[in-house]
Amino acid sequence: MKESIHGPILSLNHGTYAIRISGRNDLKSVEQWYRMTKANNFSEFREAMKIQGVPMFNTGYADKEGNIYYVYNAKIPKRKPGYKWRSIIPGETSTNLWTEYIPYDSLPQIKNPAGGFIQNCNSTPYLSTGNMDEINSLPAWTGIETHQTGRAIRSLELYGLDSSISRDEFLKYKYDHTYSKSSLISKTRDKYIEHMKSDTSSVLRTGLDLLENWDLSADSTNRAAALAFLVLPKAFKPEDLKYNPDSVTKKLKQSIRFLEENYGTIDIPLGKVFILKRGQKELPLSGGPGLLRAVYYKKLDKKYIAVAGDCYIQFVEWGPDGKQQAWSIHQYGSATKDKSSPHYGDQANLFYQEKMKQIR
């Protein structure tokens, strides 16, 4: 592969491009991961993070001393002003060549926020505690997200508004199945239903009524969620909430036909259509895209199979005496590729029931 001062070169039929990637030639990630796992306290952990060998990933920290910490871990280039950095920039000059990075200490981060919790769901770091004034901000040219995902909104509604959270409440919130009324899927539903108020088509009316009365729950027994999942998630562009009502109507017609032809009704329980599949097991799942119980699906014949979202989950707590307890779950089991192993799918039943096993 050819190289330029900016990085590797790609020659395509519409042009020749050089790609510059943060940390491309940095081999310190292994050292950083090692030091993070060997850290005995917050100071050692933060020193490991300052290596900046790992160029990405939101990072959270907690310890037996009661400390919690969040950092928007990123190797962000110090870019020169005057260029549209969200677009393709000229490659025939070195004047736009960046060689330095934002220092670790300047990244958005916070230790022990007043609210007593941290969260980030691939959303803006500035609202990781629910209070934008608590976390230092950087200029817009850094490219840091400013949007809130549905999971982040719901996380702040649940964890952020509860001043005293028990273990059971913590897990209940993590497995929450309900979309916020402020989520994009809720806003899209409401906007589309309002747009279709004047439509009296008998073909669509039943489907529209089902969507309008949907309580935003993605419990496996919910009878409106299946239609909602088939119609709404791809109906909008997250960055601007713009959508074409005609394309939504087309998707609604297709989804009504699919459910009626395969299940005889459009108000089929979600878990009959959207499932966890492992070997011969087919298990009804609660949860969906953009929820704290995150599940993303792919169509396979007449069913939609979970392919992404929640996977390995670990829950750790320290008692007043500093004693640690931990629980975990994997959507399948510890032998992810060995179909002959008893551990190929032995955790699937616990996973779909939203239970965890204690680590001993």
What would you call each of these model-derived segments?
Residues 1-194, 200, 204-360:
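C-terminal/peripheral segments of proteins
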